[in-house]
Amino acid sequence: LEEGLPSLGLRVRTGHWGIAGEPPVLLVDFKPLWQEKDTLYFELWKAYALESDKGYGDYDESSLFAIAAARLMESIAAWRSEERTIAIFNEWQTAMGLLYLRQHAPQIRTLFITHATTVGRSIAGNDKDLYTYMDAYDGDQMARELGVEAKHQVEKLAAHEASVFATVSKLTAREAKQLLGREPIVLPNGFHVGTSPLTAPMLSKRKKARQLLGAVASRLYGQTIDPKQAFFISLGGRYEYRNKGIDLFIESLHHFAESYQGERDVVAFLLVPAWEAGPRADLQYLLTHPQEEQSNPLQYPMLSHWLYNTEHDRAVCHIRHRGLDRADSRVKVIFVPCYLNGLDGVLDLSYYDLLVGMDLTIYPSYYEPWGYTPLESIRYGVPTITTTLAGFGLWAEEEQMTKPFASAPHRPVHVVERTDTNIPETIEMISSLIARQLSLSLEEQKEQRKKAYELARCADWKLFYRHYEAAYEQMK
């Protein structure tokens, strides 16, 4: 394979991915294709009337990478011509590669998976009502209105040209059919579940995470927050304020704080990468000098890292507006605006190593085709709140009606009904669920964490891969 690659005019590295199974991997440098860009785009315009001249931002880089990957696939298929070849393309970013194969290697069977539609995400992200008017939306017209014509067009073409078209949930299947004009099959997202969170090593990780979370909260707010007594909540994900439910996360905490009379500190962590300017030196110093006395909260106690746009950041403004940065309140919010890769300079733990220390996660999403974050949460034994507008939420709601979850007194996944218009009711429900979780005994919490892990195992790739096998059968 390596001997034949130079003729492609692309720089390629071969190796193995360092995960279980060590699958072979090809890394391709697509930069040489920049000089061919106009020719490649013209070829696809002739074949499909694809208007790539309307693309902007990451359109060109995504498209050229997709074509480079498709050329590698074409080469591999020719090398192993006696075998049936299947090429899988995910999202609009790789869609042009599928179109390239249709022109240059039509014998390769293709699967196109959209994990969200370009137009659907844009409608939701622009504060328009996606679900009330879903059956009336025209994908092409909305793409023009929202300025995403090229991305939508290549995505729609791939959906129609693919041997099999798929998406990740029933929720998004309806959206894809309406906006892209072809009904997809559903391939739900699985997860490698791994070790139980109730084993000794995982419990040790949980203890370490809680000690760190307590220390950070204590230093930011200038008071002792005992990790053994505190109740830790988190939301993680992309900084899509409405789509990911960050707005409702803060509003629900505010609503809860207004009536909370308990003695336990409730600390909510917003784990969302933003325009981070680096770790706080004052916080770093205090964390590394535990004997240093402190009588007052730090400036901007809701921030673990500095931001370039602190005064204008939407989450910071919202937190301050709702008084969730007050040291005298039992309910506090801490915004962690960095990528949690274990090297952020303050927490220095990965996202998963922090997640295991939480008592509850909240993902009140408005637009969530699947929703890995609540699935990741229960994999680590942390109960979660999600909504009926998340594909995972609908799956979990259905799964929890079966044994052994139907009889469980405290379900690990709370699925809150959310629509375009019921925001006050959603906030009220999330607030009451926080209170309910706080009231559980240690034994009830332990049983709920156990059920959370058991539910996560129902979404293991070992079980969900059968959906892919069924898709491959359709390609014969």
PLM segments and residue spans:
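Catalytic cores of nucleotide-sugar-dependent glycosyltransferases that transfer UDP/GDP/TDP-activated
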Residues: 1-476
